[in-house]
Regions:
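Membrane-helix interface "capping/anchor" motifs
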Residues: 44-54, 94-99
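Hydrophobic transmembrane alpha-helices
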Residues: 1-45, 49
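Small-polar-interrupted transmembrane alpha-helices in polytopic inner-membrane proteins
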Residues: 17, 54-62
Length: 164
């Protein structure tokens, strides 16, 4: 893929993540976070190109969200680490079905911890409960919804986003 197409694809993924997060903002921010846009983190299984777009999309959404600079910093870092872990999982685990399930759990663990601690600090919420609530939202979106979504689009991914 040439440089222009890579930039456009990265921008499109960032815009899709940010827009999806902000359209359902009441569900996207808070101790229960059901960010439907988090389904997109599993696209990193297909190409590292998505790492930048997803991280940028999270940064944009958090800039416009209610949790301030802490979310811009820590939310973006959490997404970046999660997407990197998703990308590297099939490099370590060769069975594609197992790799998909394990990859889907990284955002649950990483965001649960980082965002849970951040929200607990910002809003004086109980730490363990807040970590659990954030992790639960991630698990529902990324594993329960995301895994079937990825299994559905997997045969079509080259047609949906050509030249990967």
């Amino acid at each position: 893929m040439n440089k222009t197409k890579r930039i456009v694809t990265t921008a499109a993924i960032a815009a899709l993540y940010a827009a999806t997060t902000l359209v359902i903002a009441p569900l996207s921010f808070g101790n229960y976070q059901f960010r439907i846009s988090e389904v997109l983190v599993l696209l990193a299984l297909f190409d590292p190109l998505y790492i930048g777009g997803l991280t940028l999309g999270c940064f944009i959404a958090n800039m416009l969200g209610p949790n301030g600079i802490m979310d811009v910093i820590f939310g973006t870092i959490a997404t970046f680490i999660s997407v990197l872990a998703v990308y590297y999982t099939p490099k370590v685990i060769r069975n594609s079905k197992t790799a998909l399930i394990i990859a889907s759990l990284w955002p649950t663990i990483i965001n649960g911890l980082i965002i849970g601690v951040m929200l607990s600090y910002l809003y004086a919420l109980p730490l363990i409960l807040t970590i659990f609530q954030v992790a639960l939202g991630e698990f529902v979106v990324v594993t329960i919804l995301g895994v079937p979504f990825i299994n559905f689009i997997k045969p079509y991914i080259k047609k949906i986003i050509p030249n990967l």
